[in-house]
Amino acid sequence: MQKNMKTKKTKKRGRKEGNTPETERRMEPARSRTSAIPSGLRRRSGPSTPLRPGPEVRHAPTWRTASATTADSHRISPPYTPSSRGRHIHTRGARTRTRETSAAEINGVYARAVTRKTKRSETIDRLLLSVLPGHGPHASLRSHLRARSALRPPPDPPR
């Protein structure tokens, strides 16, 4: 164990003595690699990264000229507005499918009941349903009771 350490030391000493600027430069990446800084941080910081020249010259005044601002305004995209057609349907997770929205849907014929949870793509407006016979406010309850009463005879009146 000690022998190994000794040989390592002598090797280092030999390398240090015969150092030329070229070998020094060659060794530098190896030395920085052993440092404890994570590679992402190391890559960003330090003089090794070439400094990109800024858009403005250093001695120029800081305020922008009118021509520069107009050029900038052209470059900036207009505020994002989702298209009137193509609605996002939520599937499991964060993925979304786009579905063509029908003209009726755009004009507001369908109910607000079309939420991301409903499996049916389209529903008829609740007001329209309430007008139709057998589709009133408690239609589902009534139909359920009707189905049950058809199966067995009506119960005897209470005494």
From Swiss-Prot:
Signal peptide annotation: none
Biased composition regions of type Basic and acidic residues, renumbered to the chain: 16-31
Regions of compositional bias (Basic residues) in chain numbering: 1-15, 85-96
Region feature (Disordered): 1-100, 133-159
Protein name: Protein B1
Record organism: Human herpesvirus 6B (strain Z29) (HHV-6 variant B)
Gene behind the chain: B1
